[in-house]
Every structure is written in C-alpha cells, then in structure tokens.
Amino acid sequence: MTALRDYVKSFLLVELLQGLRLTGKHFLSRSVTLEYPEEKTPKSPRFRGMHALRRYPNGEERCIACKLCEAVCPALAITIEAGPREDDGTRRTTLYEIDMFKCIYCGFCEESCPVDSIVETREHEYHMEHREERVFDKARLLANGDKYEAQIAADRAADAPYR
C-alpha cells in the first residue's frame, strides 16, 4: 500500500508542488537583505569600530599612561611608552600606537581604561592604502577622538545605566 501511495505522490508531483508553494510564499514577502553601500543597518551604541583617544573638555588628553589597555590586549596590538610632563611632572604617554592588523576589536582596552581615554567608535568603513598606515599613532587617535567626540559622548550617555 505504501508503494502505491509513493508512486501516486511522485506521479502527481506532490513534493514539487509543496516546494513551489513554500517558495512562492517567501518570494512574495519583503526582502531581508540590504544593498550595503546604499542602505545601512543601524548600529548599536556598543558597536566596536575604529579606535579613538578622548580629551577632557579643556583640551587635555585623558590618557594617564597606566598601560592597562596594553596589558589586557589579547592580540598585543597596543604599544605605550610613558614619560613625565614638563609643566607638572605627571605621567603622560609619549608613544601610543595601535596596530590595526593585530587588533581583534574585543573592547578589552576600552573596558579596562580607568579614565575613558581609549574608546571604539561606530566607524567601521575605513581603509589603508599603504601597509605602514595600519599603525594608528597618538596623533591619529586623538584626531579620531576629536572628530567623533559628540557621537562618543552620546553613546556613553546611552550606555551609562548598564555600566
């Protein structure tokens, strides 16, 4: 009896019609994919993208050269050298570099920073034309921080209840 039923199902193409019905149902529904460069998905305030160093409102850089971000980095992408300041003798960074080819964007550096100096912005569309550009130095990181400070502050404010 089952052999006869299987023969009738295959003769009437029941499985094919069931598959066509399912395909037709999804064919008429709204598209899930986006055309990436033209359409972009919204990003979370916790998105981890390009790194930046922040400044205080008076223009002084926040980094106190504690080297916690360098110590906690699992990819060993951060290099810091510290030295005393000329005016008040406090410790500040003389060299702050992040090798973006090594970075895995884990966010540990951001979490470990006691003064919220190193942050990751929402910017993920950046490129490098030469291999030497992969190392972001202190000047470039500070420039990123100045450029995205409004967005960084808004993201920090939105995320504050969860910290």
Curated annotation (Swiss-Prot):
InterPro entries: 4Fe4S_Fe-S-bd, 4Fe4S_Fe_S_CS, NADH_quinone_OxRdtase_chainI. Its EC number is 7.1.1.-. It is found in: Cell inner membrane. It is a peripheral membrane protein. The keyword Translocase applies. It is an enzyme of class 7 (translocase). Binds 2 [4Fe-4S] clusters per subunit. It catalyses: a quinone + NADH + 5 H(+)(in) = a quinol + NAD(+) + 4 H(+)(out). Residues 53-83, 94-123 form the 4Fe-4S ferredoxin-type domain. Its cofactor is [4Fe-4S] cluster. GO terms for cellular component: plasma membrane. GO terms for biological process: aerobic respiration. NDH-1 shuttles electrons from NADH, via FMN and iron-sulfur (Fe-S) centers, to quinones in the respiratory chain. The immediate electron acceptor for the enzyme in this species is believed to be ubiquinone. Couples the redox reaction to proton translocation (for every two electrons transferred, four hydrogen ions are translocated across the cytoplasmic membrane), and thus conserves the redox energy in a proton gradient. This is NADH-quinone oxidoreductase subunit I. The gene is nuoI.
